[in-house]
């Protein structure tokens, strides 16, 4: 079973979700949030890095998946989100994990089947896919959704590669 660490980055709260998958079967391993709210920004970045490092040591994931930056209404918010992502990605890079990035639309499409789904729909589907007894907190659910999205992306690439008989100009052809 492949273990995936999914991260929903944030400068005040960073969600994480860990799942194992084999084929279409998922196993929930853990989720939660790295709480950062009451610290100076540079300390929060350090806490993200340290939190990611601890999660990698605890769960030994084989891959790391993270949400891409979206353009917020406030440019300062987008910059802080980018820095939070950077701190998380460095944690993965220091552990030599491959890093995969997905947009919010890709994640929602993979988990809910609708790229415009809202947070409650994502939480509901994550709960159902992973057969959780309760609804996960929003940031943890988003991180689990990122991990599920990555698993689906891997499965689709494997199917595509298996169905291709040759390549033409670098593209797979049947």
UniProtKB/Swiss-Prot annotation:
Binding site for Mg(2+) 1: 8, 139
Main location: cytoplasm
Key word Magnesium present: yes
Cellular component GO terms held in the UniProt record: cytoplasm; Holliday junction resolvase complex
Catalytic reaction list: Endonucleolytic cleavage at a junction such as a reciprocal single-stranded crossover between two homologous DNA duplexes (Holliday junction)
Amino-acid positions noted as binding Mg(2+) 2 in the UniProt annotation, renumbered to this chain: 67
Cysteine disulfide partners in this protein: none
Keyword match Magnesium: yes
Quaternary structure (record): Homodimer which binds Holliday junction (HJ) DNA. The HJ becomes 2-fold symmetrical on binding to RuvC with unstacked arms; it has a different conformation from HJ DNA in complex with RuvA. In the full resolvosome a probable DNA-RuvA(4)-RuvB(12)-RuvC(2) complex forms which resolves the HJ.
Entry's family note: Belongs to the RuvC family.
Function, in words: The RuvA-RuvB-RuvC complex processes Holliday junction (HJ) DNA during genetic recombination and DNA repair. Endonuclease that resolves HJ intermediates. Cleaves cruciform DNA by making single-stranded nicks across the HJ at symmetrical positions within the homologous arms, yielding a 5'-phosphate and a 3'-hydroxyl group; requires a central core of homology in the junction. The consensus cleavage sequence is 5'-(A/T)TT(C/G)-3'. Cleavage occurs on the 3'-side of the TT dinucleotide at the point of strand exchange.
NCBIfam families, A to Z: ruvC
Protein name: Crossover junction endodeoxyribonuclease RuvC
Annotated organism of origin: Pseudoalteromonas translucida (strain TAC 125)
């Amino acid at each position: 079973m492949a273990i995936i660490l999914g991260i929903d980055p944030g400068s005040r709260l960073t969600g994480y979700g860990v799942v194992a998958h084999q084929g279409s079967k998922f196993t929930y391993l853990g989720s939660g949030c790295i709480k950062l709210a009451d610290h100076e920004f540079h300390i929060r970045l350090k806490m993200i890095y340290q939190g990611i490092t601890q999660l990698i040591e605890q769960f030994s994931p084989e891959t790391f998946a993270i949400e891409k930056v979206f353009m917020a209404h406030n440019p300062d918010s987008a910059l802080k989100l980018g820095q939070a992502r950077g701190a998380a990605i460095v944690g993965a890079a220091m552990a030599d994990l491959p890093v995969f990035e997905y947009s919010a639309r890709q994640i929602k499409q993979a988990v809910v089947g609708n790229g415009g789904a809202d947070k409650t729909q994502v939480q509901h589907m994550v709960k159902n896919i992973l057969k959780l007894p309760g609804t996960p907190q929003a940031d943890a659910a988003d991180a689990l959704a990122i991990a599920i999205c990555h698993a689906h992306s891997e499965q689709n690439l494997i199917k595509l590669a298996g169905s291709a008989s040759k390549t033409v100009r670098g593209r797979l052809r049947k």
